Amino acid sequence: MLTAPSLGYSLLAPILIVLAGAVIGVLVEAFVGKARRTAIQVTLSIGVLLLSLQQLWRIKDLSSTTAAVGSVTIDKAGIFLQATIILLSLVAVLLIADQDNFVAQASALPGSPEEQNALQEKSQQTEIFPLFLFAVSGMMLFTVASD
């Protein structure tokens, strides 16, 4: 009979919060209309990163070598690196949210009529935000991985 592994959810919460935000971002991308999608994605990304930073602050004095069956070691250095990643990610989200520097659609060539039509229709693609959150969660896990 198999036994379930014991996980330190409170110690893994900063990573899990960012992962959950990425999944919610994918759902927003799938089900929200394009007129409201950008504002929701930016707000969601910033909110998720701030919530994760708050959880990191809560666990700043804790440590564990068995947070995920020995594969994750939570210590002060890992928490510091995770906080650094989150703070830099907050700045990066604001840079990504500036849509003037990105093409409206990935398939449109810069300066082409397709790009002009996409800019006039304000049909910007926003899947970068959930992809970015998935990448941030991976970076956060990388800093505390011990296996």
Tell where the protein language model's regions lie, with residue ranges:
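Alpha-helical transmembrane segments of multi-pass membrane proteins predominantly involved
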Residues: 1-147
